[in-house]
Design a protein with these regions (language model features):
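Loop/turn-to-beta-strand initiation segments
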Residues: 1, 91, 141-145
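Post-DEXD/H (motif II) to motif III coupling segment of the RecA-like Helicase ATP-binding lobe
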Residues: 1-45, 223
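Short hydrophobic segments within beta-strands
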Residues: 3, 93-97, 122, 168, ...
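A short beta-strand-to-loop transition that corresponds to the Sensor-1 phosphate-sensing loop
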Residues: 3-7, 97-99, 148-151
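Short glycine-/polar-rich loops that comprise or flank the Walker A/P-loop
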Residues: 13, 21-24, 40-43, 115-118, ...
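Conserved interdomain hinge at the start of the Helicase C-terminal
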Residues: 57-97, 101-112
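Conserved RecA-like helicase motor-core motifs
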Residues: 93, 107, 111-132
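Conserved RecA-like P-loop NTPase helicase motor core
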Residues: 124-225
């Protein structure tokens, strides 16, 4: 028997699994688990940032990597994420993709303004023991901010006391997005709901739609398919 909460949505992946284990049987859905109060209720807030006309025109000539580079190193965007994280009540997880270009700069913007709130930076080189310590501390906190890479905190971390998730970096992976959402669905003693903030970047001009906005549209389709 093979069990998973997240197929990647491709026909090839499904056929490979069926070849190994037999027909795929979906025994429940995220929405059904929410309705049965087995997991926390989830609210999704999509925040679309409109970029300047000059940037929109320039982005037409960019490849995907150039667009990502611009997004994660955009000072105004990072300030927006910082202000958002600091404005939220409850424990907040800020997920990013690139450590040096995005994760560390975000943490350096957030941490000095936390006051008495605890803040943590987690990435691939963070010791497993330190990650577990952060997880344990967060369970006892009510207003901490964790700035963590997708690779370290999108899967395998069980934090029941997590109230907010911010997608600070764009991601086109169905599995990564759903598994990241799963971090916020655990029920806690004082937690019955969680909120996901999905940040997108609108650089459309004429008939052109930028790469990461296309990926955002795909994420919205996933949310609709999962009835989130």
């Amino acid at each position: 028997i093979g069990c998973t909460g997240t197929l990647d949505g491709t026909q090839t992946h499904r056929l490979v699994l069926e070849g190994l284990f037999g027909p795929v049987l979906q025994v429940t859905t995220t929405k059904d688990l929410m309705d049965d109060k087995q997991i926390a209720d989830l609210k999704i807030k999509c925040l679309v940032l409109k970029h300047s006309e000059e940037i929109c025109k320039a982005s037409r000539k960019w490849d995907y990597d150039t667009e990502i580079e611009y997004i994660v190193m955009n000072a105004a965007r990072n300030k927006f994420i910082t202000n958002l994280a600091l404005s939220l009540e409850g424990n907040t997880l800020v997920l990013y993709q690139f450590v040096e270009k995005h994760g560390k700069p975000l943490y350096e913007m957030i941490s000095p303004r936390c006051g008495e709130r605890k803040s943590f930076l987690i990435y691939g080189k963070t010791d497993v023991e330190d990650r577990e310590e952060v997880r344990a501390l967060t369970e006892q906190e009510q207003n901490a901010i964790i700035v963590a890479s997708y690779g370290t905190f999108s899967t395998g971390i069980n934090i029941r006391n997590l109230h907010n998730i911010i997608f600070a970096s764009p991601s086109k992976s169905r599995v990564r997005n759903l598994q990241s959402i799963g971090r916020g669905l655990r029920l806690g003693d004082n937690k019955k709901e969680a909120t996901l903030f999905d940040i997108a970047d609108d650089m459309r001009t004429g008939k052109y739609t930028n790469f990461t906005l296309q990926h955002f549209v795909e994420r919205v389709k996933i949310y609709e398919e999962e009835k989130l």
